[in-house]
Regions:
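P-loop NTPase motor domains
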Residues: 27-36, 43, 53-57, 65-352, ...
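Hydrophobic alpha-helical transmembrane segments
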Residues: 2-14
Length: 516
């Protein structure tokens, strides 16, 4: 039987547990959601805890601001952990009070709610800026002509378009530069801000060019615009057709009102004020138009980066992160990649760090583009890969290690081969991570490699839960086909063709009475 002293100890321990329980129950009512508290606590340090390394050492993996400032490249098939890794980065950036811009081609609802909840937890709701192509009525505005000189704006617009004919590209560049010199003059000297619709009007007709010339007071700029108007022939208008079409597709799109909104994003000011910007591009709905929108924003970042380096002392430059999901869809040609690589190489000095994510290196058709992107990013995470070429390249990127290859000499024996005790031992170099390792990674598991100093490992990415703020949902009624009339233009056209044919055969019917 237990002694009285043991009974007293047991009673004391039980009483302590009960006291602690009731203390928390009575005095911690109304506190924040435990998940929110845990998230806030985990984001207190300056470094981002991404997860835990399982090879070569078991230890936490943390990324510093230097890692982000020297750019991060994330690869992985859908559903294997890319979004979770990005979530760790943007959650830390928001909770630390730093600036952020994320281009989300998927326009994921969960990401939008993550940003709203994180800003609320960090008491930064006034810093949140949402540009949403799916909901232009509630979106922040964006004007590509707000920041930059005429040459910068020309390069921004030309770079957003995929060109197949160099001739039409050159004609468009020359025309844009002339017109934009006038628009920039009006913006900077008269405070008259133009938008893409104004630009489209100015390059579409002689009347538009002439109207612009009348507004400009500076003699040399006005003379150049008048010269453009004088040579505005039918052939010249045809040469500009591609440019006009591309601008029309943006201005007249369902999200075209974003370009004309009074509440407009100023990228330079947003960086300096550490704003939290989410751009929902909705590539599934708008596809090519969404990609052009994303390219315009990236070009604005390049202009803002240059303005920061030129005008802001180094100690006053904020830490601003740029996250680009489905990167390869936005930067899809060699010219675009060269421009973006130039931005990567220069934006470190302005305090901008870039994180790009996409599926595999096979997304880049041009090998030059592939090499440029790999060389310009210092840290790489690769989740499971199925493309053999990508696996081979990534294994080479991580590198090799020295090991000894041993061989044994055998001889035939009655009961099979037997060792003779002789053999060789040769020093060889083998992959640290064989290509097959990249093919067989589990969900949430990635190979990590970084330069300067050289680091590598296998990491299990940390899953974080962001408690969402309850919001009233607006249900959108889907149109019912049975309640609508079908236009059926083709059926109507065939019907009229039949009537016309019958009229030809019937001499009593007057053909002019029929509409074709």
């Amino acid at each position: 039987a237990p002694t009285p002293s043991l009974k007293l100890v047991a009673i004391a321990v039980a009483g302590s547990y009960l006291a602690v329980y009731w203390y928390h129950f009575l005095f911690h009512l109304g506190e924040k959601d435990p998940a929110a508290v845990n998230l806030v606590e985990s984001m207190r340090g300056n470094d981002i805890e991404i997860g835990r390394l399982t090879h070569p050492k078991r230890m936490p993996l943390r990324l510093s601001w230097r890692d982000i400032n020297h750019h991060i490249h994330i690869l992985g098939q859908p559903g294997v952990g890319k979004s979770v890794l990005l979530k760790n980065i943007y959650a830390h950036q928001i909770m630390q009070g730093e600036g952020l811009l994320m281009l989300d081609l998927k326009a994921d609802y969960k990401v939008r709610e993550d940003f709203k909840s994180l800003c609320k937890m960090a008491d930064r709701e006034q810093d949140f800026v949402l540009i949403d192509l799916s909901h232009p009525e509630s979106s922040y505005g964006y004007n590509p002509l707000l920041l930059g000189n005429a040459t910068e704006l020309k390069d921004k617009i030309i770079g957003a378009i995929e060109w197949s004919e160099p001739y039409y590209k050159k004609v468009s560049e020359r025309t844009l530069l002339t017109v934009l010199r006038g628009l920039v003059y009006l913006r900077d000297q008269k405070g008259m801000v133009s938008n893409l619709e104004d630009l489209l009007v100015a390059i579409s007709t002689v009347q538009g060019v002439t109207l612009l010339a009348e507004q400009v007071d500076e003699a040399s700029i006005r003379a150049d615009i008048q010269s453009l108007a004088a040579g505005f022939s039918k052939d010249f208008a045809k040469d500009l057709e591609s440019l006009k079409t591309e601008l029309t597709l943006l201005v007249k799109a369902e999200f075209g009102s974003i370009f004309k909104s009074d509440k407009t994003l100023d990228v330079f000011s947003a960086i300096m004020e550490k704003k939290v910007i989410l751009v929902n591009l909705d590539g599934q709905t708008y596809n090519e138009s969404a990609k052009k929108f994303g390219r315009l924003l990236l070009a604005d970042l390049r202009s803002a980066s240059g303005a920061i380096v030129t005008n802001i002392p180094e100690q006053e430059r904020p830490r601003f992160a740029v996250l680009v999901d489905e990167f390869s869809d936005i930067v899809s040609t060699e010219d675009m990649a060269k421009t973006f690589v130039g931005f990567l190489n220069r934006c470190r000095g302005s305090g901008i760090g870039v994180v790009i994510a996409h599926q595999s290196l096979g997304d880049f058709k041009d090998p030059t583009v592939k090499a440029q992107i790999m060389d310009s990013t210092e840290t790489m995470f690769s989740f499971v890969q199925k493309d053999p070429e990508t696996c081979d390249i990534l294994a080479s990127v991580v590198g090799t290690k020295e090991s000894y290859e041993k061989t044994k000499q055998t001889k035939e024996w009655i009961f099979g081969d037997d060792n003779t005790g002789m053999g060789t031992k040769k020093l060889v170099h083998e992959f640290i991570y064989h290509p097959n390792v990249f093919r067989n990674l589990n969900v949430g598991e990635a190979i990590y490699a970084a330069k300067k100093p050289s680091r590598f490992g296998t990491v299990h990415v940390k899953m974080i839960e962001i408690p969402h703020v309850p919001q009233e949902q607006t249900k959108v009624k889907a149109p019912c086909i049975s309640d609508m009339k079908t236009l059926a233009l083709n059926d109507e056209l065939n019907k009229r063709r039949t009537e016309y044919t019958s009229a030809i055969r019937n001499s009593t019917t007057k053909i002019e009475d029929l509409e074709i």
